[in-house]
Amino acid sequence: GAFACVQHGLRRIEEGLTVVPEVRTTLLKAYVDQSPTDYDPEQVSQYAIAYAHEAADPFLRRVYYGAGLMKLNAADVGAQEVYEKSLGYGMLFADVKPYTHRERRKKDKIRIGYISGDFRQHVMQYFVWPFLAGYDANVFEVYVYSLGKSDQYTDFFKTLVTKWRDLSAHARDMERIAREIHADEVDILFDLAGHTAGTGLAALAWKPAPVQLSGLGYMATTGLPAVDYFVTDHCCDPEGSGSEAFYVEKLLRLTSQFCYNGYTHLPRSTGTPARGRGYIQFASFNQYQKLRDPVLRAWQEIMERVP
């Protein structure tokens, strides 16, 4: 199968990896990006985590482990297993010496920092937009730590915040990023990416801010003890569901659902094309790797039920 082919290919390039270690990352990403209909995501998760333990480079170690956790969320495993595997991510930082915060530094305003690689055309923008646009500037200062590529949406986000730090050139050096955040005297640091691609989650291991949160971009525990809170809502983690047992963080449930804000410049609707065609047209604009047999079966049932 596909998994066996990748294993064979990786064995053949082991010698070359000592010269070009990034090849392993490229191959792993190519495999992770395939649809779960082509392979067992739990196997890929185990494979990535095994590579994490082998990697000498701390950055690659965290990348591999994070990729393994991402894939585990696509596997048919329970929340307990995801939680237990996530704890291993936190153990990768056992030798990190975190900053201490004995008392709040004296500033006129509360300083909030957001860190992510997705301040661009990305689904995350629709959820973070209200946070960046709706804060009270008399009470808060907002700092953004951007680790990814820039586009026209990035330019717009820059107009909303107090300070914009483009740290994309240092995305492999999480200790340096943590040092810069600490130097900015951020009071609350919010990681928006979790274990998704281009994340800055690892910087939180150094505890650069006295209060640290994660959420929005990844809907499971980070496994990182330095993260104090996980932002969720009553739909993803209902009260009384027992979700707290599967997080190292304390859950912060929004009083409403997630603060989604779509485009404001879309053209006005002229009505559904289905009225003219006589049938409904379905589409999905998700990443291919999210497709699984249960999803395809659900789509099949929808198509069979709709005239």
Can you describe what each PLM-predicted range is?
Residues 1-279, 287, 297:
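Alpha-helical solenoid repeat scaffolds of the TPR/TPR-like class and their adjacent stem/linker regions
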Residues 139-141, 300-307:
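A conserved nucleotide-sugar
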Residues 292, 298-299:
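Integrase module of LTR retroelements
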